[in-house]
Amino acid sequence: MKMHPLIKVYGSLTYRDPKTAKEDAEAMTLVNQVKKRFPHLLFMHIKNEGKKTKAQADFDKAMGMLAGASDFVFLGTPPLLLEMKRKDNTLSTWQPNQQMFLLKAQEQGCKVCVALGWEAAMEAVEDWMRIKK
């Protein structure tokens, strides 16, 4: 998986393990850890993955769903947009528009990143907490 040079990556790009946890499991662990360690934070997961019928995709688009939207949005100034990938990034792929979404959000003042696994995502959240107002 090729990373865009303008998007901050948390985690090791050289880590390899074919048995590394799936992205969904990493995301659930992140949610549990953030709620446990930082219960005051407001954040949400954007359900923008999976197969959809054309009718469902059209409905979601009409309701404001954006192709490529990040997995997590943490509310604050600036907001943090976090794209979660598997710890072994060779087992992950970019979906269409994900990198473009992050770059556009970054241009508008958001802190954006890709996190390889939940531990890397926690590091990103902790870094963001040091700069947010």
Residue ranges and their predicted role:
Residues M1-K133:
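Catalytic phosphate/metal-binding cores of nucleic-acid and nucleotide-processing enzymes, i.e., regions
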